[in-house]
Amino acid sequence: MYSGSSDGESHDTSTQRKIPPASSMLWVRNLRRYIGSGAGLGSEALMELETKRILLEIFKEKQQKSQEAGTIPSFYKKKPEEGSISQRVQKLAKYRFLKKQSDLLLNADDLAAMWVCLRENCVIDDATGAEKMNYEDFCHIASVCTEQIGPKCRRFFSPSNFMKFEKDEAGRIAILPFYLYVMRTVSLTQARIDMSELDEDSDGFLHSDEMESYIGGLIPNLAQLRDMPPAFNQMYCRIASQKFFFFCDPHRRGRACIKKILLSNCLQELMELHQESEEEVTDTEQAENWFSLTSAQRICDMFLALDKDMSGSLCKQELKEYADGTLTEIFIERVFDEHVRRGKIVAGNSREMDFDSFLDFVLALENKDTPEGLTYLFRCLDLQGRGFLTTADIHSLFRDVHQKWIEGGNYELCIEDVRDEIWDMVKPSDPLKITLGDLLGCKQGGTVASMLIDVRGFWAHDNRENLLQEEEEPPEEESQ
C-alpha cells in the first residue's frame, strides 16, 4: 500500500520532469511573435503599441544623450512648428499652469483680510509704538488667516520667512514690512503670470509688441494714467516699453528677459503710478518718473519740436538743438555713428534718427550714472573704437566743450588742467588710458561724461560748490 503510493508519486514526478517549459514550446513562441508584431490587433491597440514603442525609443535616446553629455546642458531647443500638435499641447499646458498659479494668488480682499488679522493679533512696542509680533503670534496669525482666507496664504507664514525680517531684543518683527513683503510677492507673481501669457513662443523673453501689450493692459489699473487720452495710449506704451528694453536688453536683440524685467527698477517705477491722488506726488517727481503721463508727453513734445521738417525722424542738424544746443558737435556725430540704425536715409541725405533711437538717446542722457546709460555714452566717447580713452581722446572731446564755454562768455580754461582733473577723478588702473570699467568703478562716470559732451554739464561741475550752497539755503530761510 505504502509502496504503491510511493510508486505513484515517483511516476508523477518523472512525468513532470519530462514536460518542457512553456517558453520552449513552438506554439508559444509563434504566439508571442504574432502578438509582438501587432498583426491582428485593432486600430486602438496598434496605436497604443506604437505610442509605447516611440516613447521607449525617446527615453532610450535621451538616456544615451545624457550619459554622453554628462553635465553639459543643451544650448539649443527646437521650437515646435506653427500649428503643430506639439505647439497646441504646449499652449494648453502653459494656459493650465498659469491658471493654476493665478488661482493660488491672494486677491485684494484676501490682502485686506490678512492686514486686519495682523493688526488684531499683534502687540504694540511701548518704546516706538510700532506694531510687532513674535514667532508665537506669527503662528497664531497663520492659523487665523488660513481659516479666513484659505490655505493659499499659508506659504507666507513659513519659519524661513519669519527669519528674513529684522528682530528686536524680544525676537519680534514689525508687521508692516512683513505685509509689504506679501504684497510685493503677490504683485511680482501676478506680473510674471501676465507677462508669461503674452510670451507667445514661451521662451521667457518678451518682444517690443508683447511688452507694449502688457503695459497697455496695466493702464486702466494705474491711478495716474486713467485720464490719459485714448489717442495717446499707443504712443505712451511705445515710450514706456523702450525704457524696459534700454535696461533689460543691453545687446539690443529686440527681446527682454522676463526675469530681468521683474527684477529691474523699471517695473517698480511703473508701479509707483498706482498712487491714487496726485497730491501724493509732486510735479518734480512726476517729471522724473519716466512712466508718468507728464514725462511721456514731455518727450513726445520734445521730439516734435526738434523734427522741423516733420519727417518723423531727426537729422544731425535737428538733434543739435536738443537741450538748447549745449551738446557738442563731435558727440552728436558719434551718436549717429554708433547708435543710429544703418540704412535710415531720407531723400538722399545722411542717416536720420527714428523715434526709438531718440528714446534711447534721451534715456542715456537722463541716466548717465547707470551702467546702461554710461555704456551707451562710452561708445560715443571712444573715438577710435578701441575700448579705452587716451589723453588725446579727452583733448579732442573737450575741445568742443571749451569752444562753447568761451562763446558763452565764461573765463578762459586750460584744456590740460581739465584733462588732469578727469584723470584724478577716475583714477584708472592703467595710467595711460580710461576704460568703461574705470568709469563705472570710480562712481563719477556720469559726471565725467557730462563734462566731455555738454557745456552745461561742465558748468554744473565747475560750479558744484555754489550749487550745493543754494540747495542748502532754502531750509535755513524757512526755519528763520
From Swiss-Prot:
Keyword Calcium appears in the UniProt entry: yes
Tissue-wise expression: Widely expressed.
Domain EF-hand: 186-221, 294-329, 369-404
InterPro entries: EF-hand-dom_pair, EF_Hand_1_Ca_BS, EF_hand_dom, PPP2R3C
Biological process, per Gene Ontology: cortical cytoskeleton organization; microtubule cytoskeleton organization; preprophase band assembly; regulation of dephosphorylation; unidimensional cell growth
Binding of Ca(2+), residues: 307, 309, 311, 313, 318
Gene3D superfamilies on file: EF-hand
Protein keywords: Calcium, Cytoplasm, Cytoskeleton, Metal-binding, Repeat
GO molecular-function term, one example from the UniProt record: calcium ion binding
Cellular compartments per GO CC: cytoplasm; nucleus; phragmoplast; spindle
Main location: cytoplasm
Record localization: Cytoplasm; Cytoplasm, Cytoskeleton
Consequences of knocking out this gene: Extreme phenotype with disrupted cell elongation and a highly compressed apical-basal axis due to disorganization of the interphase microtubule array and lack of the preprophase band before mitosis. Sterile flowers.
Primary role: Probable regulatory subunit of type 2A protein phosphatase involved in the control of the dynamic organization of the cortical cytoskeleton. Plays an important role in the organization of interphase microtubule arrays in part through the regulation of nucleation geometry. Required for the reorganization of cortical arrays in response to light.
Subunit field text: Interacts with PP2AA1.
Protein name: Probable serine/threonine-protein phosphatase 2A regulatory subunit B'' subunit TON2
Origin species: Arabidopsis thaliana
